[in-house]
From Swiss-Prot:
Gene from which this protein is expressed: Pdcd6
Organism per entry: Mus musculus
Domain notes: Interacts with different set of proteins thanks to 3 different hydrophobic pockets. Hydrophobic pockets 1 and 2, which mediate interaction with PDCD6IP, are largely formed by residues from EF-hand 3 (EF3) to 5 (EF5), as well as by Tyr-180 (EF5) of a dimerizing molecule (Pocket 1) and from EF-hand (EF2) to 4 (EF4) (Pocket 2). Hydrophobic pocket 3, which mediates interaction with SEC31A, is mainly formed by residues from EF-hand 1 (EF1) to 3 (EF3).
Binding locations of Mg(2+): D169, D171, D173, W175
Membrane topology listed for this record: Peripheral membrane protein
Protein name, per record: Programmed cell death protein 6
Length: 191
């Protein structure tokens, strides 16, 4: 099961809990075969997107699917083989557990207050104004809430931007030439 390499969660903190055990290999192999529609031995982003559910009866965010595939596709084949799929399975399952933890009203969506709780739990300290920006950016349905797949995508993007910011914040004071939130606001406005 070396396919799953732990990636710290958003903020460098816990993110998806790494504690959940994988189902047995035969179960995962059966799932893999059902998802691998063209029997190529590699699950493409389209195949994975069709297999995933975000709980809203809308297609899983293709950007999220591509991000997840790229994290686990060690051979740059635009998909994941069975070994890599076990990592994808665990990664998504871990994110489901995080999502359910912070979806306090069990609506299947993360609202602004739940998002604040989640990001605070990951170690982020952001303003209400910035939480509004995140909701607007990742709410594909325009309901003021974020679905599961968009929650993953938002956390992935925030983590990547944080990593970039930290590279330039050499004295680790939360400032480069602009404040962290100004930087994120600028980047999110063009992403």
């Amino acid at each position: 099961m070396a396919a799953y390499s732990y990636r710290p969660g958003p903020g460098g903190g816990p993110g998806p809990a790494a504690g959940a055990a994988l189902p047995d290999q035969s179960f995962l192999w059966n799932v893999f075969q059902r998802v691998d529609k063209d029997r190529s031995g590699v699950i493409s982003d389209n195949e994975l997107q069709q297999a995933l559910s975000n709980g809203t009866w809308t297609p899983f965010n293709p950007v999220t699917v591509r991000s997840i595939i790229s994290m686990f596709d060690r051979e740059n084949k635009a998909g994941v083989n069975f070994s890599e799929f076990t990592g994808v399975w665990k990664y998504i399952t871990d994110w489901q557990n995080v999502f359910r933890t912070y979806d306090r009203d069990n609506s299947g969506m993360i609202d602004k207050n739940e998002l604040k709780q989640a990001l605070s739990g990951f170690g982020y300290r952001l303003s209400d104004q910035f939480h509004d920006i995140l909701i607007r950016k990742f709410d594909r349905q325009g309901r003021g809430q974020i679905a599961f797949d968009d929650f993953i995508q938002g956390c992935i993007v925030l983590q990547r931007l944080t990593d970039i910011f930290r590279r330039y914040d050499t004295d680790q004071d939360g400032w480069i030439q602009v404040s962290y939130e100004q930087y994120l606001s600028m980047v999110f406005s063009i992403v």
